[in-house]
């Protein structure tokens, strides 16, 4: 508390306002006339009733902070304010030095009961006759008991309720207060219009099941709290907000969302656990900013009747009249009666259901009942008062749903002016803003469905989040027009692919245009200089023996050549061989030199490739033991050097993450009892995942190292439910790899096994009392229930990670795989299930993981696509041409059409061919001069059909050659391997592709009939015939 500074100027300014109203009472402050002192006491901090009470409001208004267990006594003449509180609070309050004719007296309440009692009696002794208080706040605590005891002991004191005079003083806002309330109102209207409205419409439109309470929680999280920051993506949508101190922001109450025929328009209403339903939806929410409250309430009409629209329009008219009546000098009861009478004239039914009040004053205290806008309140409204105006009608009979009712509501925060009220929470009031007609949209979608589909596919490039969803719907096309739909799909793919390939080639030429005519596409190789010894004196003494010496410390080999000791760094040595000849041993040392036959690795760069190089040097010696020792030393040194260089290259892209900033003040959100993969120490370790301010942390239960992942390094966040799996997963794919133990990784996941939640009741009473399948059925039901609970737990936690990351201005969304679009393949060594997501193709169920980001894919080439083969391969060429293509092999041919349709829907260029290609050679050619590659047609060579010669090369990979028949577009085409978008011939039509499986079955049946006929003709007595028949039946 030492860093708290009180605003002395504000305190004395506002205290003077109280004394001025006290010395010249009029109107609502008339009750202060016969009072000589006012005692305001706030009880213990755990007093839940103290929330938004007048006592709290007065303390915040004067001091800017809440001081629990504190007594304030105002004395009229002379002007004096006495504080009774603990020592720590007294130290802060003593910042207030006497000023503007107001004395300050701070009395420290002792921890000793006797001394505390004497202090309180001393304060009470200064009171005479009547004194003002706020008895309705009902504070509790030891300080309150001491005060009540001292007042009773004196006996001649009379308590007067000064709630109305205090309300009158607080009601009129100054410039700073109005500025803060306007900011509070902007926050409220922003979250209502820019988040709740769109979120609610999305839930209704998609038919998502979400409870009122859950939706209210999502709204409440947008403001942020101590565990996570605010959602700046939302708040930045309102540029008029400016700089906001979100630490001083909170919701006045949890947002109230109501639908489905159950409505409560009272201030005490709360969201229930029922799901959000179409129809009439009411939403109320309010934000408190720097202790000042605002409120906003709206009615949203989903497929309303004409009557409901008329009723809402009537409320808008009445609201407009009410705003005109709320001006300086107006009486609260007159305003209510005029509005009610106007409504009765327009619609008597609505008037009968009209609320009993139009609203209330607000500010530091959310609801000040002293200024209720009802028929009985005769108090005048003053300029710069701030009210919550509520126009509402309750329990109207619903003609659509007999037996049910609905309510309509419009609530705003308004400021009283000379000529009427100004709305501070404007927006989303017009009928067009709040009406959402679902039925008309459905009717429009049904009729022109077939006509609209081609237009959708020919439209400009769409976000991938929508295309994947569209793919799911397209896959469900059924009915009499199946062949027409299939043909339409093939034509759409063909048209879209032509556009994508043209765009790909044009973008490639433009991207590499700066390198035209040069070889800058390939990465320039750096010539490394090595200096084993700077001076001759540094050579080891062992070289004086004129023998080969291996210097491990300098990573060099010193060779005796013509009487001189010549050092060679180990990097210049390619390898060493030894040959035994009778009594001699020959040691041959081969050096790195240009012009050698290139293997899989790139050639070593040389400063001057045209210089003279020694390729090898041989030494012959009778000391076989020494030569063997030298051989082993050089070999070991070379292996160590190669290992170091390999590790350096592997760790080149590993980053050093910034420090994780932990959440302070509260415990972070935690997902307990999970296992990370890969493990921090290479072992299976359980622990908890925590969400902190700028990232997530895995905290192991054992001695293993913790894992920190920053939001800035998260590229994709996946949630994979336990459907058809034994585990439920939250998977993080990183932008740059990090070190886990001694290994680097680009993927970290946290999972929990579903099986470990199961248990058996073998031997229990229930098991012995039942027989049959009842136990198994019950166990299956329990298993499904546990799976659903676990999925929800992990999905909610993934959503919390998403929210926390977005609050830190990172674009991160939870991606869930589409299992219905999945297919099997071999990305590494074994067959696994590969699942498309909105942005990726993934396999995260087991190690090693596969995550391919579709936005980084240049083109996808389908290999071994030809009639008769059961599998095909898929090659992802990445936009970063330096990276090797990603291969997924042995995909069942039954998934070919679905894979092509999915890739096309994601706007990924596709090509296909009958054989495997030599991709290292292709990529080497591309990287040598990318501009020339794209200028000469780019990847168009992949879209040509395979030649007749190439059709015989079944599953073996072919070497890439620029003039190969495989890529010669003028060569003959194989109709069976032709792609769906590669020609207009009837043989390549969508119909023949879709019926390919049926043709094969028909051929098999014909072969079987021919075998039977052949066996009959031969008399059926040949063993060979029998064997052939059996073999044919298994074909």
From Swiss-Prot:
GO annotations of cellular component type: FACT complex
Transport listed as a keyword: no
PANTHER family linked to this entry: CDC68 RELATED (PTHR13980), FACT COMPLEX SUBUNIT SPT16 (PTHR13980:SF15)
UniProt feature, compositional bias: Basic and acidic residues: 1003-1027
Organism of provenance: Cryptococcus neoformans var. neoformans serotype D (strain JEC21 / ATCC MYA-565)
Membrane-crossing segments per the record: none
Gene that this sequence comes from: SPT16
Function: Component of the FACT complex, a general chromatin factor that acts to reorganize nucleosomes. The FACT complex is involved in multiple processes that require DNA as a template such as mRNA elongation, DNA replication and DNA repair. During transcription elongation the FACT complex acts as a histone chaperone that both destabilizes and restores nucleosomal structure.
Protein name per Swiss-Prot or TrEMBL: FACT complex subunit SPT16
């Amino acid at each position: 508390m030492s860093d708290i500074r009180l605003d002395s100027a504000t305190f004395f300014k506002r205290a003077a306002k109280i004394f001025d109203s006290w010395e010249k009472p009029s109107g609502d402050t008339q009750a202060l006339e016969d009072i000589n002192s006012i005692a305001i006491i706030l009880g213990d901090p755990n007093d839940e009733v103290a929330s938004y009470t007048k006592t709290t409001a007065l303390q915040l208004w004067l001091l800017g902070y809440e001081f629990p267990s504190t007594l304030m006594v105002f004395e009229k003449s002379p002007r004096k304010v006495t504080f009774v509180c603990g020592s720590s609070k007294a130290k802060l309050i003593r910042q207030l030095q006497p000023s503007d004719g107001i004395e300050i007296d701070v009395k420290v309440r002792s921890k000793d009961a006797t001394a505390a009692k004497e202090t309180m009696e001393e304060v009470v002794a200064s009171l005479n006759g009547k004194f003002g208080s706020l008895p309705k706040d009902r504070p509790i605590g030891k300080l309150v008991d001491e005060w009540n005891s001292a007042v009773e002991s004196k006996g001649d004191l009379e308590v007067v309720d000064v709630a109305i005079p205090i309300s009158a003083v607080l009601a009129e806002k100054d410039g700073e207060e109005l500025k803060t309330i306007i900011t509070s109102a902007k926050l409220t209207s922003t979250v209502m219009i820019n988040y709740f409205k769109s979120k609610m419409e999305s839930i209704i439109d998609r038919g998502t099941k979400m409870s009122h309470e859950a939706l209210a929680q999502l709204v409440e999280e947008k403001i942020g709290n101590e565990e996570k920051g605010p959602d700046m993506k939302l708040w930045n949508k309102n540029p008029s907000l400016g700089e906001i101190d979100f630490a001083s922001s909170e919701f006045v109450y949890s947002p109230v969302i109501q639908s489905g025929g159950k409505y409560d328009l009272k201030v005490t209403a709360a969201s229930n656990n029922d799901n959000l339903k179409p129809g009439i939806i009411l939403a109320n929410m309010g934000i408190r900013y720097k202790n000042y409250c605002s409120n906003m309430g709206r009615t949203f009409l989903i497929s309303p009747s004409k009557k409901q629209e008329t009723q809402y329009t009537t409320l808008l008219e009445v609201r407009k009249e009410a705003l005109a009546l709320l001006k300086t000098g107006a009486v609260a009861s007159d305003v209510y009666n005029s509005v009610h009478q106007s409504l009765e004239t327009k619609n008597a039914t609505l008037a009968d259901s009209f609320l009993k009040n139009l609203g209330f004053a607000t500010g530091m205290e959310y609801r000040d009942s002293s200024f209720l806008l009802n028929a009985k309140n005769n108090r005048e409204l003053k300029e710069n008062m701030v009210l919550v105006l509520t126009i509402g009608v309750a329990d109207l009979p619903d003609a659509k749903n007999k037996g049910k009712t609905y309510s309509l509501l419009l609530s705003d925060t308004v400021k009283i002016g000379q000529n009427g009220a100004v709305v501070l929470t404007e927006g989303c009031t017009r009928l067009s803003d709040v009406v959402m007609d679902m039925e008309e949209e459905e009717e429009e979608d049904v009729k022109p469905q077939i006509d609209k589909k081609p237009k959708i596919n020919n439209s400009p490039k769409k976000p991938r989040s929508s295309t994947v969803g569209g793919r799911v719907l397209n896959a469900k096309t059924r009915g009499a027009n199946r062949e027409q739909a299939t043909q339409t799909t093939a034509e759409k793919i063909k048209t879209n692919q032509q556009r994508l390939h043209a765009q790909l080639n044009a973008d490639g030429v433009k991207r590499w245009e700066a390198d035209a005519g040069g070889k800058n596409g390939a990465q320039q190789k750096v010539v490394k200089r090595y200096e084993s010894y700077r001076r001759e004196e540094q050579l080891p003494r062992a070289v004086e023996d004129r023998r080969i010496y291996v210097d491990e410390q300098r990573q060099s080999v010193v060779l005796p050549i013509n009487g001189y000791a010549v050092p060679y760094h180990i990097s210049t040595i390619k390898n060493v061989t030894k040959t035994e000849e009778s009594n001699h041993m020959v040691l041959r040392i081969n050096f790195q030199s240009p012009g050698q036959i290139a293997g899989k690795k790139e050639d070593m760069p040389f400063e001057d490739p045209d210089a003279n190089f020694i390729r090898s040097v041989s030494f012959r010696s009778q000391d076989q033991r020494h030569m063997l020792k030298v051989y082993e030393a050089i070999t070991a040194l070379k292996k160590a050097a190669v290992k170091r260089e390999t590790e350096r290259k592997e760790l080149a892209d590993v980053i050093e993450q910034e420090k994780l900033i932990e959440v302070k003040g509260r415990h972070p959100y935690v997902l307990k009892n999970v296992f990370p993969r890969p493990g921090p120490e290479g072992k299976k370790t359980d622990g908890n995942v925590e969400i902190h301010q700028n990232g997530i942390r895995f905290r192991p239960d054992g001695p293993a190292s913790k894992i920190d992942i920053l939001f800035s390094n998260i590229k994709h966040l996946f949630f994979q439910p336990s459907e058809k799996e034994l585990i439920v997963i939250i998977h993080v794919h990183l932008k740059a790899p990090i070190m886990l133990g001694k290994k680097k990784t680009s993927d970290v996941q946290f999972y929990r096994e579903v099986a470990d939640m199961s248990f058996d009741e073998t031997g229990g009473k229930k098991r012995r009392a039942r027989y049959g399948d009842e136990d198994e059925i019950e166990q299956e039901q329990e298993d499904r229930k546990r799976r659903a609970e676990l999925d929800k737990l992990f999905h909610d936690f993934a959503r919390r990670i998403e929210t926390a990351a977005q609050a830190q201005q990172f674009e991160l969304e939870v991606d869930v795989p589409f299992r219905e679009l999945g297919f099997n393949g071999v990305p590494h060594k074994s067959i696994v299930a590969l699942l498309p997501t909105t942005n990726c193709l993934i396999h995260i169920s087991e190690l090693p993981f596969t995550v391919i980001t579709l936005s980084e894919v240049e083109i996808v080439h389908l290999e071994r696509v030809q009639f008769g083969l059961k599998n095909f391969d898929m090659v992802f060429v990445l936009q970063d041409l330096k990276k090797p293509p990603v291969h997924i092999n042995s995909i069942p041919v039954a998934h070919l059409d679905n894979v092509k349709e999915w890739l096309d829907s994601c706007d990924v260029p596709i090509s296909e061919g009958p054989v495997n290609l030599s991709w290292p050679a292709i990529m080497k050619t591309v990287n040598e001069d990318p501009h020339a590659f794209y200028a000469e047609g780019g990847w168009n060579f992949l879209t040509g059909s395979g030649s007749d010669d190439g059709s015989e090369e079944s599953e073996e990979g072919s070497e890439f050659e620029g003039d190969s028949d495989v890529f010669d577009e003028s060569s003959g085409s194989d109709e069976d391997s032709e792609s769906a978008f590669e020609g207009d011939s009837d043989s390549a039509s969508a119909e023949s592709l879709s019926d390919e499986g049926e043709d094969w079955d028909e051929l098999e049946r014909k072969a079987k009939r021919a075998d039977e006929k052949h066996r009959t003709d031969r008399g059926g007595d040949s063993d060979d015939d029998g064997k052939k028949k059996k073999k044919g039946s298994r074909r």
